[in-house]
């Protein structure tokens, strides 16, 4: 299932490598992203500085989730991630706890985009390497098909 995220508020809690990767994936589909973290990667800092992400450099507050469609908890604090999960479930917000598959309402597929075609591949969070191999195979097939035209 693909969801139009263009007008949906997305909150990412965390500023490390996983949060940065998730944000870069989401930026392919929306610019309505808020990242909340006391510290961030340099890449995420630059995305905020360039205006691609609303970057809030402080610990997360419950009020950060007001009107959120989805929240990604990508901190290195499992207690905080668990609290984020609990708050989101109470408020009916889709949530993804990056390091706990059992606390994910959605997964991040491997994405391949070419012109108007978007392909998403997931192994339901179970086998990332296999999903990546399938994405590469699809990418190679799509590129070969384009070369034939």
What is each residue range found by the language model?
Residues 4, 112-149:
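Adenosine-phosphate binding glycine-rich loop
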Residues 1-22, 130, 149:
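Glycine-rich adenosine-cofactor-binding loop
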Residues 33, 55, 94-95:
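Hydrophobic beta-strand scaffold residues
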Residues 37, 55-59, 99:
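Short loop/edge segments at beta-strand edges and connector loops
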Residues 21, 29-47:
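NAD(P)-binding Rossmann-fold cofactor-contacting core
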Residues 70-75, 81-107:
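ADP-ribose/adenylate-binding Rossmann-like module
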Residues 17-18, 78-79, 125:
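Residue-level detector of alpha-helix initiation sites
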Residues 46-66:
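Glycine-rich, highly charged phosphate/nucleotide-binding loops
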